[in-house]
Amino acid sequence: MKFLDEAKVYIRSGDGGNGCVAFRREKFIEFGGPNGGNGGRGGDIIVEAADGLNTLIDYRYQQHFKAQKGGNGMGSDRHGAGGKDIVMKVPVGTQIFDEDKETLIHDFTKVGERFVLAKGGNGGFGNAHFKSSTNRAPRHANPGLPGEERWIWLRLKLIADAGLVGLPNAGKSTFLSKVSAAKPKIADYPFTTLHPQLGVVNSDGREFVLADIPGLIEGAHEGAGLGDRFLGHIERCRVLLHLIDATCEHAGKAYKTVRGELEAYAETLVDKIEIVALNKIDAVEPDELKKQKDRLKRAAKKTPLLLSGVTGQGVPEVLRALVAVIGEAPVSDKAIGTADNPAEAKPWAPQDA
């Protein structure tokens, strides 16, 4: 299934039905009086967070959603039927923004959560509603009220316990495929991973969700490489596993490049719990490995873990370290532009794939 993390959608709730002008007509009843029914209420547009979804791809093929109009009132005091609601299913982690892409309307954080995005118009009153002691035979009724319409943006930020970050070709996809059943594309060239990948990892009987975030390069927050379109997914990760390629020119500089991009995008990202690991240790000589480890230790101000995603060396230790810190991390880090502070929401270029 293709991955899509942002979509623009048009919605319109149903118009209310019109009220009816009618009078009772029966044999031997000279003054039957008004009996026009009220119009039905228009259908709502409802958004629901559904289990089993991890992409907004459905909204590439259908961008317009219009709820049903309420039925018109009829004689004999018959009221119009209510219009059918439309329920739009989205993955957990989806945010709804106004057309300006900055005003946050709602943020879905749990399965089954529902939000009424547009309410249907109320039905109009029939002439029976207007009967009074001074107006025994009203000959007017109300039209139904129109529904609400607007353009909105759906933006998905994947929710994972841990996120893999690093430069392109740091071995993130190889690591994910080694520790989970996920099958990301793996090749010896930059930007092999074009979309975030999720995998469920089991370590010593403890399960957690690991996300492989496409590689970042210098200037990513300004649109370089794959840009900052995936940095938003990191906001929802409780812990970061930062992988550095031991075969790169300078492990310390590689570490600082990624940290700089995270900080430039949002200062909250650098405050997350981070585990630093030097990958591909099987591909370098012992002397070079020691140099790279020392460089990385000075840059990160912590001793990095050593591992090889290909041979599996050091992988169990990294997983145990992740399990240990995931338990300490906040259950849900506050994302930029959440409902408490929508003004901080940052514009984000759509993922078009």
From Swiss-Prot:
One of its GO terms (biological process) is ribosome biogenesis. Residues 1-159 form the Obg domain. It is an enzyme of class 3 (hydrolase). Residues 160-327 form the OBG-type G domain. Mg(2+) binds at S173, T193. CDD domains: Obg. One of its GO terms (cellular component) is cytoplasm. Its EC number is 3.6.5.-. It is found in: Cytoplasm. Keywords: Cytoplasm, GTP-binding, Hydrolase, Magnesium, Metal-binding, Nucleotide-binding. One of its GO terms (molecular function) is GTP binding. Its cofactor is Mg(2+). Transmembrane segments: none annotated. GTP binds at residues 166-173, 191-195, 212-215, 279-282, 308-310. InterPro entries: G_OBG, GTP-bd, GTP-bd_Obg/CgtA, GTP1-OBG_CS, GTP1_OBG_dom, GTP1_OBG_dom_sf, OBG_GTPase, P-loop_NTPase. Belongs to the TRAFAC class OBG-HflX-like GTPase superfamily. OBG GTPase family. An essential GTPase which binds GTP, GDP and possibly (p)ppGpp with moderate affinity, with high nucleotide exchange rates and a fairly low GTP hydrolysis rate. Plays a role in control of the cell cycle, stress response, ribosome biogenesis and in those bacteria that undergo differentiation, in morphogenesis control. Monomer. NCBIfam families: Obg_CgtA, PRK12297.1, PRK12299.1. This is GTPase Obg. It comes from Rhodopseudomonas palustris (strain TIE-1). The lineage of its organism: Bacteria, Pseudomonadati, Pseudomonadota, Alphaproteobacteria, Hyphomicrobiales. The gene is obg.
